[in-house]
């Protein structure tokens, strides 16, 4: 693990995701730079996976309403010891957030059911906490990730 600027990494992940995205992705951070010890490639994988999951959820909404516009809001807040990342989307939500963390469980025709368990494992390897829940039934997902912060 090495010292990385999480704000910069998320911005890069968003730029990469936007190349194939039709959704609106908003990003807000109270700090211009926030440092953590991490594996840049693995954390990038986390952020891309979470954005991709939202995109896939939006497809179901678009089937019901062709004018639907997917929105992903990503926000970082920090205190003295931890940063908290919040990913919110306005997709269909997750039927059972606990089951979604079970390897090989999927509700998608093409999914492997490994995305969220891998994301959780990567966050745990970074001494972090990964939480997932619905904002409201059928109204989107809220994912919270806490990671230990280090000094600049």
Ranges and model annotations:
Residues 123-124:
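Detector for a conserved hydrophobic position within an alpha-helical segment of the HATPase_c
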Residues 94-104:
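Short conserved segment of the HATPase_c
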Residues 55-78:
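ATP-lid-like helix-loop hinge signature
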Residues 115, 119:
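Short alpha-helical Gxxx[C/S/T] motif in the catalytic ATP-binding
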Residues 35-38, 107:
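Conserved micro-motifs of the catalytic ATP-binding
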Residues 24-34:
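Conserved catalytic submotifs in the C-terminal HATPase_c
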Residues 2-14:
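A conserved beta-strand-to-alpha-helix junction within the catalytic ATP-binding
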Residues 127-134:
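Glycine-rich ATP-binding loops of the HATPase_c
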């Amino acid at each position: 693990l090495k010292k990385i600027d999480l704000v910069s990494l998320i911005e890069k992940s968003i730029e990469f995701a936007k190349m194939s995205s039709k959704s609106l992705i908003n990003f807000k951070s109270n700090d211009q730079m926030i440092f953590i010890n991490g594996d840049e490639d693995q954390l990038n994988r986390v952020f891309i996976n979470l954005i991709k999951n939202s995109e896939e959820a939006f497809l179901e909404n678009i089937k019901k309403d062709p004018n639907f516009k997917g929105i992903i809001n990503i926000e970082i807040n920090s205190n003295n010891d931890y940063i908290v990342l919040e990913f919110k989307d306005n997709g269909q939500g997750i039927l059972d957030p606990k089951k979604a963390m079970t390897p090989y469980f999927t509700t998608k025709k093409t999914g492997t059911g490994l995305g969220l368990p891998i994301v959780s494992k990567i966050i745990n390897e970074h001494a972090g906490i990964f939480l997932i829940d619905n904002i409201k039934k059928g109204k989107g997902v809220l994912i919270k990730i806490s990671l230990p912060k280090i000094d600049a």
